[in-house]
Amino acid sequence: MEGPTHLKATNDHRYEEKTRKREERETIDIRKEGSRGEKNNMDIISILPAECISHIVSCTTPQDACRSSLVSHLFRIAADSDIVWERFLPQGYKEIISSSLNSLSKKDLYFHLCNHPIIIGNGNMSMALEKQSGKKCYMVGARELTAIWGDTPPYWQWISLPESRFSQVAELNYVWWLDIKGYIETKNLSPRTTYAAYFVYQLSSQDNPGTAATPVTLCVAYEHSAVAVEHSVILDPVTYEGTAPPHARYRGDGWFEIEMGEFVTEEDNATVVCSLVETSDYNCKSGLIVEGIELRPKE
């Protein structure tokens, strides 16, 4: 004869078994419902015209468009369409691209502009696109910069280098005062964007230690602004005698760059001034080669 303890254990086991089976049924029902929901969503998507999906994708970003192409074959067709990538190209792009690029799809043209800057502004500026966002990147070439005694041959000279995107770059022969400025109109940049400005340069084999080791003052500010943040750096891309950490970064294209500062494009008709100055040390400076000042959206 079974005792009370054995009956209780049997009842507990039956209860646990019923509970387990009920939970399994509920899980199966949930999965079926989820599957039906996903199927319904895919059915809704499948009945949308590809052009409609393209318009939806065009309201996102280039990065999101690339991701959406992985969803399905239909999405890939829509995400690769000219409707999408035309939206990501800068306004007025047809006026500045070469006729040889007209045969490219809008997507191929977009990535071409990301990887191959276009020379504009009488050959003294370049424009490219930032790959993830499609925002504009600009470089102001040395010919568009102003420098003390920049037009005086004994102090500066114009040379050609194969690694430069421009036909000419500026080489410093010798000066005692170093003052270089670049002026950028915000209407040429992407609106409501934080930009960083970079001084792009080399130091020649005839570099004077006074150029590489002497701190220079960098500043980026709106023209006529009462607020201007300055900071000092050294141009030497390696630590100079252990006195300071290097500020320069090798770009991988034969040039070094130093971040000058940042700003936000809040106005369409404002001018930003980027400056590099050293006028307190009267040592002779030479051997600096300037390609330009580049402006890129801040990550």
Write out the residue ranges for each language-model feature.
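Extreme N-terminal basic, low-complexity initiation segments
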Residues: 5-13
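Intrinsically disordered, glycine-rich low-complexity segments
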Residues: 14-36
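A positional/structural detector of protein chain ends, strongest at the extreme C-terminus
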Residues: 1-3, 298-299
